[in-house]
């Protein structure tokens, strides 16, 4: 692992409470299963499961859930030198409704939760400087002091020549308003080297038809090396300054879509960490995205995010069985 490039993931990790029966509302559910969640943490775990090297930077409540989550990171091989604890705030919780098609709705308990209270002075900047890729979302932009810490972490990475990877991961209930969400998510848009958005997020951010190239291309900026749009089981689209195209997905029986996007991102970042030239080589890029599509698909076949994250063998098995 000595020569394996480090990918640092920044943001939130929380407990998801998932109904033990899918297709029922939170009120109707008779029981809940607790599962670790939070997109940046899922990405960090996806990376190590696929043989990469990752670290997580974030803040937890000094409570049983917080220590449980950090132990899960450690058990998954994620470097936890960037985590800290808050004695005065709780670890965030989310109640997740699983609809019949495996899609989700969220109800959050975090006012404020420890992850929102991360201060710039608590950042492990040395860890960020060691990374090849620095990955983050937008939830850490919602409130202070975490927003300032997030901006400082990005600047540290950029100044050190680290690639910036952004998955906005829109969670509208956490923002004060729709307008605040769009403004906040776009406030750091032009800093990223790589951005991954879902088709729904394209529609949300542009108010346009996500299927149309000109709508997607309105999200490109001068410094952006790659824009990826995920289209669920249909696969994904990619846009660079030189080329654009689509990579088909893998049809599987989806049980729970939680973590599928994070599994996709983790898989792509592992490929990019190994070979930066994939941003300029369309053939290599398509291979990396096909592998990422397979990882995302495998993740939907089991409940929970981190427990469902695939190994390379899981993804390759699916790719072989569905080779077109």
Swiss-Prot record:
Keywords: ATP-binding, Carbohydrate metabolism, Kinase, Nucleotide-binding, Transferase
The keyword ATP-binding belongs to this UniProt entry's keyword annotation: yes
Entry's EC annotation: 2.7.1.4
GO biological process, one term: fructose metabolic process
A Pfam family the protein falls into: PfkB
Pathway in which the depicted protein is active: Glycan biosynthesis; starch biosynthesis
Class of enzymatic activity (EC top level): transferase
GO cellular component labels: cytosol
The reaction(s) this protein catalyses: D-fructose + ATP = D-fructose 6-phosphate + ADP + H(+)
Function recorded in the entry: May play an important role in maintaining the flux of carbon towards starch formation.
Family statement: Belongs to the carbohydrate kinase PfkB family.
Protein name: Probable fructokinase-5
UniProt organism field: Arabidopsis thaliana
